Regions:
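Extended, low-polarity transmembrane helix blocks
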Residues: 1-28, 52, 67-127
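Peri-membrane helix termini and adjoining interfacial loops of integral membrane proteins
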Residues: 26-39
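Generic secondary-structure boundary/loop-capping signal
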Residues: 37-42, 120
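Interfacial helix-start motif at the membrane-water boundary
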Residues: 42-60
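Generic transmembrane alpha-helix motif of multi-pass integral membrane proteins
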Residues: 60-66
């Protein structure tokens, strides 16, 4: 296995585990956000099921990434979450400091996918 891909999987798993747990236990304070970002989050929070489901999914998928079990499944489930994190931080909270971690998460996801490309290749096969 490619070492960069494996390290990327572990780092991505740790990021999702830490921020998933933070979403439940809130050990990191939420930074001040622009009004547009607060409006967006307020809409999501008004659906009381959304954040517990999201954070539970992040924790479960991070455990899969860290354990090495069902990694392609975890990467596929986390892909739209990662893209939405990137879009939220680049569009609703502009600034290089806000986009650094989401960009790193996208790059880590791409690197982690490398070891599992034969599995993902089947998704793009013409039948």
């Amino acid at each position: 296995m490619n070492k960069v891909s494996t390290v990327s999987r572990y780092v991505l798993g740790l990021i999702y585990l830490i921020f998933g747990l933070n979403g439940i236990f809130q050990f990191f304070p939420m930074p001040p956000l622009p009004e547009s970002a607060m409006g967006f989050l307020g809409g999501l929070m008004s659906a009381s099921y959304f954040f517990p489901f999201l954070k539970g999914t992040e924790i479960l998928m991070s455990i899969l990434l860290l354990s090495g079990f069902a990694v392609p499944f975890a990467l596929i489930v986390l892909a739209p979450i990662t893209i939405n994190i990137l879009l939220f931080h680049t569009i609703l909270t502009p600034g290089l400091q806000n986009a650094a971690l989401p960009v790193a998460m996208v790059l880590l996801s791409i690197a982690a996918t490398y070891n599992y490309w034969p599995t993902f290749k089947l998704l793009f096969a013409k039948k």
